[in-house]
């Protein structure tokens, strides 16, 4: 089997295509959540914290010189990324919970297995021998 055929079979499997769609949707969802945090949640927090912009919070480890920029520890961006993570994790949790609920609600159809003529005959013989 040629390399191209193997790759085509791999790429056309349902799982790979589903995963690709998931990655694309996940990237778009990440942008939406980042915008929600940066443009909605953080300004509200800034309002309640005396107009502090969390993105600008940092600790200067080494002052800037003529040749090098300042070395800073940007803990404000870290706080913002934590909010991103919490919201994304919560949204994924809600989606998985909804999917699990849908899976549980699906009615389980049980197959009724009808015995063959031989099985019926053998059952009758067994029952007669028990008497």
UniProtKB/Swiss-Prot annotation:
Keywords: Cell inner membrane, Cell membrane, Ion channel, Ion transport, Membrane, Transmembrane, Transmembrane helix, Transport. The keyword Zinc-finger does not apply. It is found in: Cell inner membrane. The chain crosses the membrane at residues 21-41, 76-96. GO terms for cellular component: plasma membrane. GO terms for molecular function: mechanosensitive monoatomic ion channel activity. It is a multi-pass membrane protein. Pfam families: MscL (PF01741). Its main location: membrane. The keyword Glycoprotein does not apply. It comes from the Bacteria. HAMAP family: MscL. Channel that opens in response to stretch forces in the membrane lipid bilayer. May participate in the regulation of osmotic pressure changes within the cell. Belongs to the MscL family. NCBIfam families: mscL, PRK00567.1-4. Homopentamer. This is Large-conductance mechanosensitive channel. The gene is mscL.
């Amino acid at each position: 089997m040629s390399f191209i055929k193997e790759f085509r079979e791999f790429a056309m499997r349902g799982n790979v295509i589903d995963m690709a769609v998931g990655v694309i949707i996940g990237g778009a969802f990440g942008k939406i959540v980042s915008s929600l945090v940066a443009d909605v949640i953080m300004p509200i927090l800034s309002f309640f914290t005396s107009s502090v912009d969390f993105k600008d919070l940092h600790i200067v480890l080494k002052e800037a010189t003529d040749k090098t920029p300042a070395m800073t520890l940007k803990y404000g961006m870290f706080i913002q990324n934590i909010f991103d993570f919490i919201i994304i994790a919560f949204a994924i949790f809600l989606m998985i919970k909804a999917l699990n609920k849908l899976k549980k609600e699906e009615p389980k159809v049980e197959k009724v297995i009808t015995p063959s003529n031989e099985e019926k005959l053998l059952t009758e013989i067994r029952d007669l021998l028990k008497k």
